[in-house]
Design a protein with these regions (language model features):
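Core beta-strand segments of extracellular beta-sandwich domains
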Residues: 28-41, 47-52, 106
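C-terminal edge beta-strand
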Residues: 20-21, 32, 36, 112-125
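Well-ordered beta-strand positions in beta-sheet-rich domains
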Residues: 48, 103, 117-121
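Sec/Tat signal peptide C-region and signal peptidase I cleavage site
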Residues: 15-19
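Bacterial N-terminal signal peptides
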Residues: 5-13
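A short beta-strand micro-motif common to beta-rich folds, especially ectodomain repeats
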Residues: 90-92, 98-111
Length: 125
């Protein structure tokens, strides 16, 4: 019974998000960035970011990077907004000369156990 509840809890903790972006053909486009930050601005743990569905007309690179967080002023971590914190970024580059639509689905797994699926529709111009 506990295993079923744990699996159900994990499935319910995966959230979906959608975004639309435009980019010039062959130019890099930041698709997504994520961070897990303690109140002292140190990392709260590693984030696993992976490509769940690759683009049909380009490539996605995932790299560890310093990112600027955007915590609301009411959050004790808002002091971290003024500096880079450890994070991860996904960047898209289309095939050279390609013009048209593309689509990427990313999956981010946070140290807290929360998961997010991110669908990004891309218009390559």
């Amino acid at each position: 019974m506990r295993i079923v509840l744990a699996v159900l809890g994990l499935l319910l903790s995966i959230v979906s998000a959608q975004a639309d972006k435009a980019v010039a053909s062959g130019r890099p486009l930041k698709l997504y960035e994520a961070y897990a930050t303690n109140p002292d601005c140190t990392s709260a743990g590693a984030i696993v970011l992976r490509v769940a569905q690759p683009p049909g007309h380009g490539r996605v690179s995932i790299n560890q990077a310093g990112v600027f967080p955007s915590f609301p002023q009411s959050n004790p971590r808002s002091a971290c907004n003024r500096r880079r914190v450890p994070g991860v970024q996904a960047t898209y580059v289309s095939q050279r000369g390609y013009l048209g639509p593309d689509l990427v689905v990313l999956q981010a797994l946070f140290p807290s156990g929360r998961g997010v699926n991110i669908t990004v529709a891309i218009r390559v111009m």
